[in-house]
From Swiss-Prot:
Species of the source: Helicobacter pylori (strain J99 / ATCC 700824)
GO biological process, one term: chorismate biosynthetic process
GO MF annotation: an example: 3-phosphoshikimate 1-carboxyvinyltransferase activity
Record-given protein name: 3-phosphoshikimate 1-carboxyvinyltransferase
Binding site for 3-phosphoshikimate: K11, S12, R16, S155, Q157, D302, K329
Length: 429
């Protein structure tokens, strides 16, 4: 059996630890921070807003928040990070000053009206390009009044932006979403003294009566990153894998549950429940069967490209529906998945809200199919999750990815761990 502690810290928790520290009064400590490009954007923005960041150990920081958030003399660059842009928009909407948030071409083409509308409901002064649809965003922070908002989409980023504004508004605010999204923001903020109550699926958020408590967080491994190694095990005959120290929040392991329904043997071993549930995940290869996915999409939206690879190894038609938000990620992930599969000669079809794939079965059947075609260069579309998903497919097929380096956005050591898995699985370890 292969045992891996992938040291790929959770991206969601790393972002939030940095951003929430700005609402504290005393120094905060973040250990095992994800040194990926997205999270480093959040860290740099915190510094531009007046936070003092000191290295305390490898991938660990002491963050001393400013007495008051500083108005920056330059644009706050979120690079490719939608989490940075959306959560900072919520935080800064109530802070005195002018703040401009921008990103790379990919981020500036992603939908931002979904956060502008709820923030405007507080009375926030926020503008975006093309009638508030896109970044750059300009925010003139000021006093906010509590509001009630029902989000048409289930999005942890939208919810988090709302909560960060609500904590600084006058009065109790309410937020409802169509489906439960990641709940790290609620868990972390409540542990730091925020009054956030869930009443029959409606979040009631009271304004902060005092700064958030200082904290010392150690970030566990990211289940979204760990899933790529779980996928590698699921498609590699006779392989067994133990992934150590992984965040097991129920809103983050839905993709593992789908893989289990497809036939993979998966078990969880809980190690702690202090703040978030953390533990180990055991995966054992087994023949996969086709599946249709149309529920709990918000809890597995990031893993759907990787699940499409599992679907390729399952005989028969697999389908994904109700996942239109895949088109609003770093790339149009529906189009990216389908176009790459078509280039590989796989029967598939694109829908507005998903796709279907005609799976070929196990690795031997895939190799027989691909022996008849010239392998194309897989297009990553500069999207880390597309690149890593198809990189896992290279365990079974000799394929080239056009830009695997974009994995550095969320999983800088991805290639190292994938190569290690390949080496150990070949050796039978």
């Amino acid at each position: 059996m292969i045992e891996l502690d992938i040291n790929a810290s959770d991206k969601s928790l790393s972002h939030r630890a940095v951003i929430f520290s700005l609402l504290a009064q005393k120094p905060c400590f973040v250990r095992n921070f994800l040194m990926g490009e997205d999270c480093l954007s959040s860290l740099e923005i915190a510094q531009n807003l007046g936070a003092k960041v000191e290295n305390t150990a490898k991938n660990s920081f002491k963050i001393t928040p400013p007495t008051t958030i500083k108005e920056p003399n330059k644009i706050l660059n979120c690079n490719n990070s939608g989490t940075s842009m959306r959560l900072y928009s919520g935080l800064l909407s109530a802070q005195k000053g002018l703040f401009v948030l921008s990103g790379d071409n990919s981020l500036n083409a992603r939908p931002m009206k979904r956060i502008i509308e709820p923030l405007k409901a507080f009375g926030a002064k926020i503008l975006g390009r093309e009638d508030n649809h896109f970044a750059p965003l300009a925010i003139v922070g000021g006093p906010l009044k509590a509001c009630d908002y029902e989000s048409p989409i289930a999005s942890a980023q939208v919810k988090s932006a709302f909560i960060l504004s609500a904590l600084q508004a006058q009065g109790i605010s309410a937020y409802k979403e169509s489906e439960l999204s990641r709940n790290h923001t609620e868990i972390m903020l409540k542990s730091l003294g925020a009054n956030i109550q869930n009443q029959d699926g409606v979040l009631k958020i009271s304004p902060l009566e005092k700064p958030l408590e200082s904290f010392d967080f150690t970030i566990a491994n990211d289940p979204s990153s760990a899933f790529f190694l779980a996928l590698a095990c699921a498609i590699t005959p006779k392989s067994r894998l133990l992934l150590k120290n992984v965040l097991l929040n129920p809103t983050r392991i839905e993709a593992f549950e789908v893989l289990k329904k497809m036939g993979a043997h998966i078990e969880y071993v809980i190690q702690s429940k202090d703040l978030e549930v953390i533990g180990d995940i055991y995966i054992e290869h087994a023949p996969l069967k086709a599946i249709s996915i149309d529920q709990n999409i918000a809890s597995l939206i990031d893993e759907i490209p990787a699940l499409s690879i599992a679907m390729l190894f399952a005989k028969g038609k697999s389908m994904v529906r109700n996942a239109k938000d895949l088109r609003a990620k770093e790339s149009d992930r529906i189009k990216a998945v389908v176009s790459n599969f078509k280039a590989l000669g796989i029967e598939c079809e694109e829908f507005e809200d998903g796709f279907y794939i005609e799976g070929l079965g196990d690795a031997s059947q895939l190799k027989q199919h691909f022996s008849k075609i010239k392998p194309p260069i897989i297009k990553s579309f500069n999207d880390h999750r597309i690149a890593m998903s198809f990189a896992v497919l290279t365990l079974a097929l000799p394929l080239e990815i056009d830009n695997l380096e974009c994995a550095n956005i969320s999983f800088p050591t991805f290639q190292l761990w994938l190569n290690l898995f390949k080496k150990r699985s070949l050796n039978g370890n």
